[in-house]
Amino acid sequence: MAAGTKEDPWELKTPPGTSSYTMYTDEQADPPALVCQVGSTTLKYRLRAIKDLHAWLKEQGDWVPLGAADEKKPAADGTVEAWGRSANNPVGGWYGLRSGYRGRFGMYLPPLLEELGLAEVSHDARNNRMRAI
């Protein structure tokens, strides 16, 4: 498995398997970040999202829909995407750090948790779900 550094990032695929992207940690950022490179687009999420999302999934105790959506689109209730921007999550709002690119939490975080052995993700063409391991 990759080290998750800029030099040795995690190489991941979206849950449907249609797109590839990389992620790595930037612990020197303020706040510490996960850097997600999708083609020429860079997205950033709070590093603590890994532990926080895993804890929330464990609380749910079952499969949770991913519900990936862009920042400007509403997220369906009860989805990973909705939790990643909810005022009721541990950071009180968005885990995404780059304005205009804060969405897609439900697309890019689940495969990382699966890679790290923290979650199981379905890999269907649409309507994917995840659960904690």
What label would you give each PLM region?
Residues M107-P111:
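Short, hydrophobic-biased segments on the C-terminal half of alpha helices
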Residues S19-T22, L43, G93, S99, ...:
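Intrinsically disordered, low-complexity segments enriched in small/polar residues
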Residues D70-K73, D77, R129, I133:
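Solvent-exposed, non-transmembrane amphipathic alpha-helical segments
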Residues D77-T79, G84-R104:
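Short helix-coil junctions and helix-kink-helix linkers
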Residues D30-A33, G93-W94, R131-I133:
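Charged, low-complexity intrinsically disordered segments and flexible loops
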Residues E114-N128:
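A short, conserved structural fragment
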Residues A2-A75:
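Long, low-complexity, charged/polar intrinsically disordered regions in eukaryotic proteins
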